[in-house]
Curated annotation (Swiss-Prot):
The gene is rnp1. It is found in: Cytoplasm. SUPFAM superfamilies: Rof/RNase P subunit-like. NCBIfam families: RNaseP1Mthb. This is Ribonuclease P protein component 1. Consists of a catalytic RNA component and at least 4 protein subunits. Forms a subcomplex with Rnp4 which stimulates the catalytic RNA.
Amino acid sequence: MWRNSEERENRTSGRSQGSYQEIIGRTWIFRGAHRGRVNKKNIVWHELIGLKVRVVNSTHPGYVGIEGYVIDETRNMLVIAGENKVWKVPKDVCIFEFETWDGTKIKISGEKLVGRPEMRLKKRWRK
């Protein structure tokens, strides 16, 4: 009955554990992504997947300095792939610096990014 018990112990609910492992070290796949429409005014409403990101400040010192490309986004977290590791970073405790395709750097608080990407479009923001 429990033939595959070893495999079951190592599994997580939802996604498989190794779902991001094949991306490690292959960050070149995001370099060709055309993200020319992202600027400081519309980054809150824009898709973040594929953008280069760096954690500038955080309440947790372990998150400061994480750098890589955003490969997934959930309501409260960004999944960032670096050169040799994948990090899951909470949005609400960090300040991020995104780099656009032309090299401009946009610094934004993670509290403004909390929420699913499709729901952020519906929010109204003060300018």
